[in-house]
Amino acid sequence: MRQKTLDVLEFEKIKSLVANETISDLGLEKVNQMMPATNFETVVFQMEETDEIAQIYNKHRLPSLSGLSKVSAFIHRADIGGVLNVSELNLIKRLIQVQNQFKTFYNQLVEEDEGVKYPILDDKMNQLPVLTDLFQQINETCDTYDLYDNASYELQGIRSKISSTNQRIRQNLDRIVKSQANQKKLSDAIVTVRNERNVIPVKAEYRQDFNGIVHDQSASGQTLYIEPSSVVEMNNQISRLRHDEAIEKERILTQLTGYVAADKDALLVAEHVMGQLDFLIAKARYSRSIKGTKPIFKEERTVYLPKAYHPLLNRETVVANTIEFMEDIETVIITGPNTGGKTVTLKTLGLIIIMAQSGLLIPTLDGSQLSVFKNVYCDIGDEQSIEQSLSTFSSHMTNIVEILKHADKHSLVLFDELGAGTDPSEGAALAMSILDHVRKIGSLVMATTHYPELKAYSCNREGVMNASVEFDVDTLSPTYKLLMGVPGRSNAFDISKKLGLSLNIINKAKTMIGTDEKEINEMIESLERNYKRVETQRLELDRLVKEAEQVHDDLSKQYQQFQNYEKSLIEEAKEKANQKIKAATKEADDIIKDLRQLREQKGADVKEHELIDKKKRLDDHYEAKSIKQNVQKQKYDKIVAGDEVKVLSYGQKGEVLEIVNDEEAIVQMGIIKMKLPIEDLEKKQKEKVKPTKMVTRQNRQTIKTELDLRGYRYEDALIELDQYLDQAVLSNYEQVYIIHGKGTGALQKGVQQHLKKHKSVSDFRGGMPSEGGFGVTVATLK
């Protein structure tokens, strides 16, 4: 992509803002290298990278990259035999520490966001090498400033000797400076250091009272810094030990440098990956600052930017506009007043495309769509000055000639005030001819103009659309709103009237313009009104769609919660049943044990095999913990609406209300209506019955699966319940619903106590929320 285009569209300012978000020189280097890609797959991948990291950044607290720095130069120096110092080793240690923290963060992220995939970050984490040994070797050998005393046995011994010798020197010198006889002879009662030797400050006139070596004197010459002869040999010993210490430190650092050289390839990979992460996190931070969104890239030529705004303008005051090249539109011509925002619209389009192809989220609403352009060409300059000289026209024409040489069908071309700076009639003619040529090349074009001739340009050419920037006549100022499909119109008469020009003058002026031009202005005015009306309706439609989507999401979540609740209740019921069977089984075992003892003691004739067989039947009643039952579906006729079926997964009867498609049907089970897989349904065969039983069967079919006792007195309710249960048993119902309402709870308690004693009821439970909750009791019949 041309550097001139990047400069005109101020891409460097965007890069500078992203650079401000980096932590390390690694990330900064990658920002400085950031350029728009032109390969489709590369552009898509870069956007996926940024979007994934942005999603993580917006939801989680990322590990700190503080202290991360470029270390490749140190690694290369280690590889060729150089020796790294403690500071350089610490930067390498920090690199390893940061990458390990990111590994830990990613592992926690995978656990927290179970089921969510992060392929980009996963790939980068898999690239990171294992450098634990090198980290420990550096960490155990030195701190931020120096090697530890225990970095080696030799170093520890040397430093121990230095410490003890220093202590002896101090003790010796302390005796001298604290001596009462020496107080008046010393400038200060302290021990100091000159030329790495321990000395005392002696007044010049008492020099002869102290044997030793003079190492320095004060600026006035009144103080001499003397190393007393009593500590000269000890100071010499310190110097020898310091030399030994330096040699040992060099040996240790050489050893550590060798470890670094051995892991050079792994370290370079770690540096590369962590630099990429710093770069991507900086992109994510910047994207959040502009509320950026991810565009959808398409192979076919597409530009759709809903509510786009220029990212360098104040987000609070800038007017966002939808910029769109509708189907089959290749050229958009924007007309309207100067300073109305036409140039900003051009720059917004160009800059957003460059940002998107550089892997940056863009300042639009969700749903933007773009194709990938091989190049963006623009001719945008100082056309908004009042006077435009010939040199200005020549400069722009030179730029346009250069654009026409290189533009092709994969290019986006932006012309600002095309043809301006010369005679209006010639400028308009040139503008139309240039647009025709670019359209022939196949480039996508957006151009601004104030020539009225170009308003009619789209009328006799396919693929051309007019647009305009709105002007508020009441405030005499532009609104900066872009009206796609509506050409700009002259507001001279309205503005003049607003400013107080005589109506006679205005009316006379109107008679001087042609009828065609008057009709065009009226048509444009009508288009503006229609555009605003349609735009208002579109915004309302968007709002309703979003509300509908939200309601759908909420209902889906509630349905899922209901299903989970239903499953938990069924599992709980089965668990209770299993516990009862387990208790009965244990009791049977105890009885069998007692009978065996009785038979052995008294020789009683006990048929143990019959007892064991009956005990085994208890095991057959154990409920599987899973809701789904392992029932082999029998093959009957095709299931249609109205069929009675058995729902295999729940073991319940139901009626098919509707066949949704080849795979699903809506089934009524009692008062529950559910969408179920057809393969989970077994059509119940109609029994062949004798004619004498026909009346009985018809009566059964009239019995509902629910009994409403609300409004009944207590005694009447129980009588009605008894009659209903008898009829339900005759109708072969497996489960019925007793509606007693909530009220004081007396009727509910009475119904449930009655059910507990009833011979035909095997179990009962309270209703689920979808079944009526506490106002319903569900009874299972034997």
UniProtKB/Swiss-Prot annotation:
Q: Which UniProt keywords apply?
A: ATP-binding, DNA-binding, Endonuclease, Hydrolase, Nuclease, Nucleotide-binding, RNA-binding, rRNA-binding
Enumerate the residues binding ATP: G336, P337, N338, T339, G340, G341, K342, T343
Q: Which InterPro entries match?
A: DNA_mismatch_repair_MutS_C, DNA_mismatch_repair_MutS_core, DNA_mismatch_repair_MutS_sf, MSSS, MutS, MutS2, P-loop_NTPase, Smr_dom
The Gene Ontology terms for molecular function here are:
ATP binding; ATP hydrolysis activity; ATP-dependent DNA damage sensor activity; endonuclease activity; mismatched DNA binding; ribosomal large subunit binding; rRNA binding
Matching entries from Pfam families are given as: MSSS, MutS_V, Smr
Look at the named UniProt entry and state the broad enzyme category this protein falls under: hydrolase
Enumerate the spans annotated as Smr domain: 707-782
Provide the GO biological process annotations: mismatch repair; negative regulation of DNA recombination; rescue of stalled ribosome
The Enzyme Commission number assigned here is 3.1.-.-, 3.6.4.-
SMART domains the UniProt entry points to: MUTSac, MUTSd, SMR
Q: Outline what the protein does.
A: Endonuclease that is involved in the suppression of homologous recombination and thus may have a key role in the control of bacterial genetic diversity.
Q: Which family does it belong to?
A: Belongs to the DNA mismatch repair MutS family. MutS2 subfamily.
How is this protein organized at the quaternary level?
A: Homodimer. Binds to stalled ribosomes, contacting rRNA.
Q: What is this protein called?
A: Endonuclease MutS2
Q: Which organism is it from?
A: Staphylococcus aureus (strain bovine RF122 / ET3-1)
State which gene encodes it.
mutS2
